[in-house]
């Protein structure tokens, strides 16, 4: 490497395709012979490749990716199932480090919790918008039923004041319908995300 400033970081890039069981490349290194930074990058690179291939837009079903990675953390001839944190680093190795994979699990759980918080914020927005649009709809009904023009103008003005950008008398009802549908979807996603966390916590190798 010509740039001496980058040499301290070269090991990660050079050896991140090595595997703990010696089946990797370019040198077929095993276990402790593989720089620790390269072992970390190996796990991160595999996770990124799987997630990119599956085009995840949410953490729902992310546990399926982690299950695939568990296979690479398990020795080919090891059939006994034990908890991830009980697997000895001195035991016959799979391709990737169970210890590092466990750290990835924790990161994925934290990322999933962050997604949950973002969805909850959006749900709060949807609920507020639905409440406002329902009030508009009630004003519309009162306007239609009003017998005096003054009353009709009063409710019409109230509707105009409650409209937000892009909303009008012609489209607010469709927007309300779409918000209600979106709320159902997001509330289900919250349940699915919490379920993903439960699944990840139960994964064993």
Predicted features and spans:
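Histidine- and acidic-residue-rich, metal-dependent catalytic cores
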Residues: 1-204
């Amino acid at each position: 490497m010509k740039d001496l400033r980058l040499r301290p970081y070269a090991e990660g890039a050079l050896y991140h395709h090595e595997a703990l069981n010696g089946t990797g490349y370019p040198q077929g290194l095993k276990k402790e012979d593989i720089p620790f930074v390269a072992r970390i990058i190996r796990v991160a690179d595999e996770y990124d490749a799987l997630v990119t291939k599956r085009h995840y837009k949410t953490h729902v079903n992310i546990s399926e990716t982690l299950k695939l990675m568990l296979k690479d953390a398990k020795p080919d001839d090891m059939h006994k199932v034990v908890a991830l944190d009980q697997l000895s680093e001195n035991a016959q190795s799979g391709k990737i480090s169970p210890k590092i994979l466990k750290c990835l699990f924790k990161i994925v759980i934290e990322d999933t919790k962050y997604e949950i918080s973002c969805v909850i914020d959006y749900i709060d927005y949807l609920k507020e918008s639905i409440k406002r649009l329902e009030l508009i709809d009630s004003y519309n009904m009162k306007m239609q039923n009003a017998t005096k023009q003054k009353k009709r103008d009063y409710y019409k003005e109230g509707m105009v004041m409650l409209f937000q950008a892009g909303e009008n008398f012609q489209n607010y009802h469709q927007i309300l319908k779409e918000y209600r549908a979106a709320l159902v979807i997001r509330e289900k996603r919250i349940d699915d995300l919490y379920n993903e966390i439960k699944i990840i916590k139960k994964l064993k190798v």
